[in-house]
Structure formats: structure tokens, C-alpha cells
């Protein structure tokens, strides 16, 4: 198939283009070989000027030998050979002149460490642009770029990969028929570069004038809703033939607080909806009859425009309807009138269940929890002053606390102990859930005293099941959140659990049984809670077996989450800080209450399956007693009838009560073009959304079938895609290669990362609690965090570019070094590396790291003096230490990824010649290496090729 012209189709890139940046003008001969016409989203050229400003410290490095320096080349690098052995000069990759390999003694610097470098422009050094969708740009707008780096940068900026967010544009009429170009690539010869995972999805190219206003925000941004297909097949048979999944990845909130991610709010309570399908009016409807009526873009019914639609009741004057938010913005929030409420909006209610058994007291869990709640009372949402709190302590009995109002004279908090666990009665419910505002002082004094009350508790009993039933009875009339803080296995009363971890089962086909619930109480109780608008969050801290598999059912069906802190102990400062920070952010997060989510779509499309933490109340309604802001949901879409329109719409609506007691509906409308052409479907497929769908599907298999079935799923689906592409679009056999579209080039690495993930990989060394907690993350993490969890980020720090670790002059955001592929072949023995999967960070110190590096980063003379394990970097007065700390902090920054999260990852310091088990753990994150029964990336690709050729 003839290659299309290089820049045809906005935002498209020929296969080799990602990540191999020419540093010098490319000679024609090399250009013909297929070297890139433009690099990924880095506008690195202007940073040359920064080089001479500050004299940097000199450290040893072979940094600039083409194949060994971690940041020397990113893209199709040749694999590094044996550590430290001189290498043959590498070919000029992507137009780099070949460099002479110099023989270097480990310690001897060739180029000073961190000094001005003939550095490659940092690929991932700039954050990828805000991934907006585009409604297309005429080909003429993307002319051939002039030569050289400046030209390439200009070319990139015209393609919308510059530093500024690319605003979607209304499509000019002459570009009708513009589609994403299909660029086949050979997976074996044009390796994937990790920077591609941060690129925006293929643009959504709609027909001209699809929306009623030319607003750049008329279509939904990918941070809220992403489709696995940005061009939808018109028939079920074409979708089936493609073997691609059609699903939406939905994350209604991109931050924990509204202020961090405001969306337009329609305050006037005029909500225009279709009479038949109940869709909300949106930018893709059509107005008829001089604007008095509108045609629904989902079911085609004609509806009347409400009279108040063009009238501002507050100001008593007519308004310009074209300014209304719901016609200009795909994501809006309507303030709901009375008919959207079953009862008055509920207040925010938190009921804390404290484990006060010996385990919880001795590890410091009780004291740290009480202290954190005390310190966070001002952060708990309470703008309407209706927020209520309640406290129950749990060992082999239930301890209720009745907190008096601050106005009561000599008001003392009283404790009531109930030992009858079969029918725990509720003493004085009115005094157990108290308004935060009216009882603030007494709540503070209670939290101060709580740890002392149980300081000498020797009980090992934990009747958490009975406590949950009592708590449910207490808050069911109002609804709200039950927050469980537990560090032992529930072993008495309702829902008691046995120690069932059996090392002999790990790594065998029977292991899956350990991931399923051991007591039906947890699932049936969770469904009961969901009906009464009660959500449960679990914070689990055991150093022993805790049966996370059973306990995680409670959050799974009530819109909650499970947080697991294995081996946690407050005596370790890092443990105490991590939990206190996460728990405080959790308490401060805004949540929706009494929420339901529904997805409607153009006639012919049907929502077939829903994945995520909620209860599926009917075929298309998902119920959330509380709606969190740090989770995503996946909805599979079926094509039931042939699609006749040239674009379809999918509208997600979340009806909820805000923390301030206001009933609202958040509406997100996504429009996608349709196509009859298989090549268009493949060219517009979104690899990150597909990997997210596979992740949710694999977790469902792990919990419902077996771990083997879960592991096989990504491999089987990927093989089907490769076979289909080869047969239908690959032009036959194509010699020894493995053909796939360039926009899906990262999918094999993501699928390998998923099968080797701690939640799924075959191993006899993974405790079932660790596995169960990982499955909770794999099925809830927002897409950007999930990609990093499956395929972690690896940064080389000892030779990072000069602009890394310092603020970008334009955005003032810290610049990260370019990410590297997860292979130990990229490591040099004198290197310093950061491996980060978003939950845990590892700082890897090479076995030959030079003393100056050790001194500057850790403040000690000898490598052997570097303390390994959980830790924090000392703040030292030198440039390089500050840059390394900045990179570690920036890598943890969720806001810059466009998601809300409370997670504060632990940092583990790993010496290559240090603690073997720690080193082994860090190495399991190197997805492309062979480890613990898992194959290397090369073996994986070889196996896929064999399966495809068969």
C-alpha cells in the first residue's frame, strides 16, 4: 500500500516519526531510509541557549556513547551491549551522525556530568501537550516543514504538538472526507518509544459544521471521556471483522476539587431534554422552525425549545442562546430543579470504624488515624455546615461514642460498649452522628483522648462485620460514607474470615480461589448498603494475612475504594507520612452523593457492559452511594443497527448531590465520526483506551474465572488484532516483519506489562493480599495513572539534559528527563535511575556510581553508606541534588497528568550491589526484561509473530 504524503491528516505521524529526533539536518539518503520528519511533542531547540549559564558538577559518564547513555537516543536505539565494553560506532539513527565509541574507564568522565551536553532534544522532557481533540485541519495548513531542527519544531507546532494546548478547530468545508491516515509500521524493526504513551489520542475528525456553535470545546476532551475508536464502524459486522473493542473510558472528574478543574455550570434550572430518549440538549443538536424546536442528535425526535431558554429570569431580560454553556461546551453541569430529587439533598456523613485491637494500637494505626482526622477537620467539606461525623471503635466488642454539642455545659463524650454481636442494638442514634460545626470542640477533645483510651488494649478480636452492620443501621436513614481503618482479620461476629493464605497454592491454578470472596456476607451486605446510599472505603494495614479479596467487595459494589498498606508501622516516619498525607487528602476530597450514571447514544448503539466500582441497578443505570473523583469507568458499546449518520454521539450523565447539598447533573457529550472503511477504524484507534479496556476485562476474568484466563486475555486479543491487520490491511506477508498501525505501536508493550503486572503475573512469590489490592487498582485507576502502573516510567538521572529538573521558563513546570524503555539494557553500571509506577518509586544506584555523584545526591562519601529501602532524599545544598528531588516530586504530581489522586508513592533507594530482594522487586518493574517466569519483550514479540504467521 502506497505511503500517504507525510503530513496528510492533522496530528498524524509516519511510523518512524515518534521519538527519534534528528539533531542536524538530515541528508537526503537518510531521509529516504525513513528517518523522521518530526519528533514527538518536544520543542527542545530553544534550550540550547540555557547551556552555558551555570557551571555544573562534573561526574563520570559514558553518557554520549550512542547506545549506552540513558538519554543519548530515545526511539529506535540499538540495544546496549555488555556494560562498559567499548562499542562499535552506532549507525546514524534518525540522522544522528555516528559517534566514535570511546574507551572509557568507569570512573573517568568524558563529558562532565551534567555539564553542557551535545544533548539530544529531550523527548519526554516536555510534558505532552494537553490532549485536546481536534475537529480537523485542512491538509494545506500542514505544509512540509523547512529543514533542520528549527524547521522540525515549526512543523510540530503547526501539527499541534507544541507546548500550548491545541484547541480543537471547526472544520473548514473544503476538507470533507478528511480522515486519520493509516501508517503501517513494522513492530520488529521500528520499536515503540515510551514517549508515545503520552501523546494525545488520534484526533476526532468530524464533518464540517457538526456542532451548532463553532466553540473549540464543543466536543468532549479526552481527560473526561475517551473512546477506543475515534472513527466508529457503521455496522456490527465491520466492528466484528476489525477485532477492535468499542468501549468508552469515562472519568467524569479530572481533579479532587472543583477549583482545580472548573466546568461551566448552568444555574437557571432550565434543562432541555429529549421527550423520547431523555438526552440533554448539547452542541450537536439541530435547531428547526426558526429556533423554536430542536432535533435530538440521539433519536431524531423533534422537541420544543423551552420558553425560558432565551430568557434570563434573574435579570429579567432576553439572552443570546448561542452563549448558553450547554451549546458551547461538551462538558457542563446543570443545577437540578426539584423533580430530580427523591428527598431533600442528604448531608455529607462520615462514620469512622476504628480497629482498636492490639495490632492496631501497637503499630500506631489508631493514634495516627485519630491525629490525621483531628488535623483535617478544617479540610472536610462543610460549606453548608451540615456535615456529620460518627465514631465506633472495634475489637471483640463494639464501642460507641456519644459526642455532646459544644453548647452543653460540662459535656463529656461518653462510651457505650456492646458485646452482643448478633443483634448489636443502637444506643441513642441521634447522639452518635453529630454535626461537625456544632460539636467541633468536643470532637477535637475526643480525638485527642481516643488513643489513650485503648493504649493498653490486649484484645486480638476484630468484629468488623458486626460493626459494619451496626454502622449501616446507624447511617442508612441519611446515607453517607463508612470509613474502615483496620489492621487485622475480622475474626469474630458477622462476616468472620479465616486465615486461608496457603503458600502451596501460590502460582498454581488453584490460586484464583484466594482472590475470590471467602464469605458471601461481604457482597450481599454491600448491595444492601448501595440501596440505602451507604458507601464503604477500606484502609487496610495488616502485616499478616487480611483477606483483601473478601473485604474489597465492600467498596467494589458501593462506589468506594480499597487502600492497602502492607506491613505498615507508624514508627517508620515514611509510613506515617504516606498514610497521613493520603488520608488527609481523602477527607478533603469533594465527592458526589446519591449518584447515578447513565450513558445514552445515537440510535443503533447500545451500552452492553459496565466495569468499575458501583452497583449495576438496571441494564443501563450504575448506582453510586458516593461518587469518588479518582476512579475511572469503562463501558462497552454494541452496534445493534447499521449507523446511517456520518457521526454518532455518546452522552454520559452523572446525577449527584454535591458536598454543599446542591443536586446537579454533570453531562459529557462525545461526538465520533462513522466510517465504512476498516483502515479508518484502525488509524483512529486509541491504544491507551484499548489497554484500559483490556485491564478491566482481565480483572473481571481474574475474579470470575481464573488468573490463567486473565493473563491469556491480553495476549489472545492482541494476536487477533495483529492477524486481522496482517490479513486485511498489511498487504500480505510483508517478509519477516510484524505489521501494525503506528498509532497502536505501544499496545504490545502495554499488553506485556499487563500480563507481567503484580496483579496478574504467574508467580509463586506474590501474597494474595498484594494481588487483590493490585486488582483493585487495575480496575479503578484513571487512564494516565493506569498506563504508568502497567508500563512504569524510567528516567536516567545521572545524564539528564540540562533543562531537566528545573522549571520550564514558559510554563514554570519542572521538566522531566525523557522517559526510557523499561529494559536493563538501558542501564549503565555508573548510572542513577528513577523507576516510578505511580504507586511506588525506586531510585536505582549503579554498582559503579562515582563518589562525587553519591556525595551530591545522598551526602555520604561511600556508596556502601547509602541507606537502602524506604527513605527520602536529604536536602543538600547543591544544584544536582535539587534537580533530582525536583524530578522525583514532579513524577509524583498527579495534577499535571490531569487526574485527581490521593496517592503519595513511597521512595525506595536500591543499590545494585545491595539488598537482593529489594533489587529483585525493582527489577520486576522492568517490563521488557525476562523475570520470574515472564518473557522479555523480544521473546514476546517473537511469540506474537509466530502466532500471527500461523
Curated annotation (Swiss-Prot):
Subcellular location(s) per record: Cytoplasm; Cytoplasmic vesicle, COPII-coated vesicle membrane; Endoplasmic reticulum membrane; Golgi apparatus membrane
GO cellular component entries: cis-Golgi network; COPII vesicle coat; endoplasmic reticulum exit site; endoplasmic reticulum membrane; equatorial cell cortex; Golgi membrane
Membrane topology: Peripheral membrane protein
Bias kind Low complexity: ranges: 8-36
GO MF, one example: SNARE binding
Domain of life per record: Eukaryota
InterPro entries, per database record: ADF-H/Gelsolin-like_dom_sf (IPR029006), Gelsolin-like_dom (IPR007123), Gelsolin-like_dom_sf (IPR036180), Sec23/24_helical_dom (IPR006900), Sec23/24_helical_dom_sf (IPR036175), Sec23/24_trunk_dom (IPR006896), Sec23_24_beta_S (IPR012990), SEC23_SEC24_subfamily (IPR050550)
Zinc finger-like: annotated span: 274-299
SUPFAM superfamilies in the cross-refs: beta-sandwich domain of Sec23/24, C-terminal, gelsolin-like domain of Sec23/24, Helical domain of Sec23/24, vWA-like, Zn-finger domain of Sec23/24
UniProt cross-references to Pfam families, sorted A to Z: Gelsolin, Sec23_BS, Sec23_helical, Sec23_trunk, zf-Sec23_Sec24
UniProt binding sites for Zn(2+): 274, 277, 296, 299
GO biological process terms, semicolon-separated: COPII-coated vesicle cargo loading; intracellular protein transport
Region of interest called Disordered, as start-end residue ranges on this chain: 1-58
Keywords: Cytoplasm, Cytoplasmic vesicle, Endoplasmic reticulum, ER-Golgi transport, Golgi apparatus, Membrane, Metal-binding, Protein transport, Transport, Zinc
Signal peptide positions on this chain: none
Family to which this protein belongs: Belongs to the SEC23/SEC24 family. SEC24 subfamily.
Subunit structure: The COPII coat is composed of at least 5 proteins: the sec23/24 complex, the sec13/31 complex, and the protein vtr-7/sar1.
Protein role: Component of the coat protein complex II (COPII) which promotes the formation of transport vesicles from the endoplasmic reticulum (ER). The coat has two main functions, the physical deformation of the endoplasmic reticulum membrane into vesicles and the selection of cargo molecules.
Protein name: Protein transport protein sec24
Species whose genome carries this gene: Neurospora crassa (strain ATCC 24698 / 74-OR23-1A / CBS 708.71 / DSM 1257 / FGSC 987)
Amino acid at each position: 500500500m502506497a505511503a500517504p504524503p507525510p503530513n496528510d491528516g492533522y496530528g498524524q505521524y509516519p511510523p518512524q516519526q515518534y521519538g527519534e529526533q534528528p539533531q542536524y539536518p538530515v541528508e537526503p539518503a537518510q531521509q529516504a531510509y525513513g528517518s523522521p520528519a518530526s519528533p514527538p511533542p518536544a520543542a527542545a531547540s530553544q534550550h540550547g541557549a540555557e547551556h552555558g549559564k551555570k557551571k555544573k558538577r562534573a561526574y563520570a559518564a559514558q553518557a554520549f556513547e550512542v547506545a549506552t547513555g540513558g538519554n543519548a537516543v530515545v526511539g529506535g536505539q540499538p540495544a546496549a551491549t555488555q556494560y562498559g565494553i567499548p562499542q562499535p560506532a552506532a549507525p546514524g539513527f534518525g540522522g544522528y551522525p555516528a559517534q566514535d565509541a570511546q574507551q572509557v574507564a568507569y570512573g573517568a568522565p568524558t563529558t562532565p556530568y551534567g555539564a553542557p551536553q551535545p544533548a539530544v532534544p529531550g523527548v519526554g522532557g516536555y510534558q505532552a501537550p494537553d490532549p485536546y481533540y481536534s475537529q480537523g485541519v485542512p491538509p494545506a495548513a500542514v505544509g512540509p516543514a523547512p529543514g533542520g531542527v528549527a524547521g522540525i519544531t515549526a512543523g510540530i507546532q503547526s501539527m499541534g504538538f507544541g507546548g500550548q494546548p491545541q484547541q480543537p478547530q471547526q472544520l473548514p468545508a473544503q476538507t470533507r472526507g478528511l480522515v486519520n491516515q493509516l501508517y503501517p509500521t513494522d513492530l520488529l524493526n521500528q520499536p515503540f518509544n515510551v514517549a508515545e504513551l503520552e501523546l494525545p489520542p488520534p484526533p476526532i475528525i468530524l464533518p464540517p459544521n457538526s456542532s451548532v456553535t463553532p466553540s473549540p470545546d464543543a466536543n468532549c476532551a479526552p481527560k473526561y471521556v475517551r473512546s477506543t475508536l475515534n472513527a466508529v464502524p457503521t455496522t456490527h459486522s465491520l466492528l466484528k471483522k476489525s477485532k477492535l473493542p468499542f468501549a468508552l473510558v469515562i472519568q467524569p472528574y479530572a481533579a479532587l476539587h472543583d477549583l482545580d478543574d472548573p466546568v461551566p455550570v448552568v444555574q437557571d434550572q432550565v434543562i432541555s431534554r429529549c421527550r423520547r430518549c431523555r438526552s440533554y440538549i448539547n452542541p450537536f443538536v439541530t435547531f428547526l422552525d426558526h429556533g423554536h424546536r430542536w432535533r435530538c442528535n440521539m433519536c431524531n425526535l423533534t422537541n420544543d425549545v423551552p420558553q425560558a431558554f432565551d430568557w434570563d429570569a434573574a435579570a429579567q431580560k432576553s439572552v443570546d442562546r448561542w452563549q448558553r454553556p450547554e451549546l458551547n461546551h461538551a462538558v457542563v453541569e446543570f443545577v437540578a430543579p426539584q423533580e430530580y430529587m427523591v428527598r431533600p439533598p442528604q448531608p455529607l456523613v462520615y462514620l469512622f470504624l476504628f480497629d482498636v485491637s492490639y495490632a492496631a494500637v501497637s503499630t500506631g494505626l489508631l493514634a495516627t488515624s485519630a491525629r490525621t482526622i483531628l488535623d483535617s477537620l478544617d479540610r472536610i467539606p462543610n460549606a453548608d455546615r451540615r456535615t456529620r461525623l460518627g465514631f465506633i471503635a472495634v475489637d471483640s466488642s463494639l464501642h460507641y461514642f456519644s459526642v455532646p454539642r459544644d453548647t452543653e455545659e460540662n459535656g463529656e463524650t461518653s462510651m457505650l460498649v456492646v458485646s452482643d454481636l448478633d443483634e448489636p442494638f443502637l444506643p441513642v442514634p441521634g447522639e452518635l452522628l453529630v454535626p461537625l460545626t456544632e460539636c467541633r470542640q468536643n470532637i477535637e477533645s475526643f480525638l485527642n483522648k481516643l488513643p489513650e483510651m485503648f493504649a493498653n488494649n490486649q484484645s486480638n478480636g476484630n468484629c468488623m462485620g458486626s460493626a459494619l452492620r451496626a454502622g449501616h443501621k446507624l447511617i442508612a436513614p441519611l446515607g453517607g460514607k463508612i470509613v474502615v481503618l483496620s489492621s487485622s482479620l475480622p475474626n469474630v461476629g458477622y462476616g468472620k474470615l479465616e486465615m486461608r493464605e496457603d503458600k502451596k497454592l501460590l502460582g498454581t491454578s488453584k490460586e484464583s480461589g484466594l482472590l475470590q470472596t471467602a464469605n458471601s456476607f461481604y457482597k450481599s451486605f454491600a448491595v444492601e448498603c448501595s440501596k440505602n446510599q451507604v458507601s464503604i472505603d477500606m484502609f487496610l494495614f495488616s502485616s499478616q494475612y487480611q483477606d483483601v479479596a473478601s473485604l474489597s467487595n465492600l467498596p467494589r459494589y458501593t462506589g468506594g475504594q480499597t487502600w492497602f498498606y502492607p506491613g505498615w508501622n507508624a514508627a517508620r516516619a515514611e509510613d506515617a507520612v504516606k498514610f497521613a498525607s493520603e488520608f488527609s487528602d481523602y477527607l478533603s476530597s469533594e465527592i458526589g452523593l446519591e449518584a447515578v450514571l447513565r450513558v445514552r447514544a445515537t440510535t443503533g448503539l447500545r451500552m452492553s457492559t459496565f466495569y468499575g466500582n458501583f452497583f449495576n441497578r438496571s441494564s443501563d443505570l450504575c448506582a453510586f452511594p458516593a461518587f469518588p473523583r479518582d476512579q475511572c469507568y469503562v463501558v462497552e458499546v454494541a452496534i445493534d443497527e447499521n449507523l446511517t449518520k456520518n457521526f454518532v454521539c455518546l452522552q454520559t450523565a452523572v446525577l449527584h448531590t454535591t458536598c454543599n447539598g446542591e443536586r446537579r447533573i454533570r453531562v459529557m457529550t462525545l461526538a465520533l465520526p462513522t466510517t465504512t472503511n476498516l483502515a479508518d477504524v484502525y488509524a483512529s484507534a486509541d491504544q491507551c483506551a484499548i489497554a484500559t479496556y483490556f485491564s478491566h476485562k482481565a480483572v473481571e476474568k481474574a475474579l470470575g474465572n481464573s488468573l490463567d484466563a486473565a493473563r491469556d486475555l491480553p495476549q489472545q486479543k492482541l494476536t487477533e488484532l495483529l492477524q486481522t491487520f496482517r490479513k486485511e490491511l498489511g498487504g500480505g506477508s510483508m517478509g519477516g516483519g510484524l505489521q501494525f498501525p503506528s498509532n497502536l505501536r505501544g499496545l504490545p508493550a502495554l499488553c506485556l506489562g499487563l500480563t507481567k503486572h503484580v496483579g496478574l503475573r504467574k508467580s509463586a512469590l506474590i501474597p494474595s493480599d498484594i494481588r487483590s489490592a493490585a486488582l483493585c487498582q487495575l480496575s479503578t485507576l484513571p487512564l494516565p495513572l493506569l498506563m504508568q502502573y502497567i508500563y512504569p516510567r524510567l528516567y536516567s538521572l545521572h545524564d539528564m539534559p540540562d533543562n531537566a529538573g528545573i522549571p520550564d521558563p514558559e510554563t514554570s513546570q519542572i521538566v522531566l528527563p525523557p522517559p526510557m524503555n523499561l529494559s536493563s539494557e538501558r542501564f549503565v553500571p555508573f548510572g542513577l535511575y528513577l523507576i516510578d509506577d505511580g504507586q511506588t518509586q525506586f531510585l536505582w544506584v549503579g554498582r559503579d556510581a562515582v563518589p562525587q555523584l553519591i556525595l551530591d545526591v545522598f551526602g555520604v562519601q561511600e556508596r556502601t553508606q547509602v541507606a537502602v529501602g524506604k527513605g527520602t532524599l536529604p536536602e543538600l545544598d547543591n544544584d544536582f541534588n535539587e534537580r533530582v528531588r525536583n524530578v522525583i516530586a514532579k513524577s509524583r504530581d498527579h495534577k499535571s497528568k490531569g487526574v485527581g489522586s490521593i496517592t503519595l508513592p513511597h521512595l525506595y533507594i536500591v543499590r545494585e550491589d545491595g539488598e537482593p530482594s529489594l533489587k529483585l522487586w525493582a527489577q520486576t518493574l522492568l517490563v521488557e526484561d525476562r523475570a520470574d517466569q515472564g518473557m522479555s519483550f523480544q521473546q514476546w514479540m517473537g511469540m506474537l509473530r509466530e502466532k500471527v504467521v500461523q
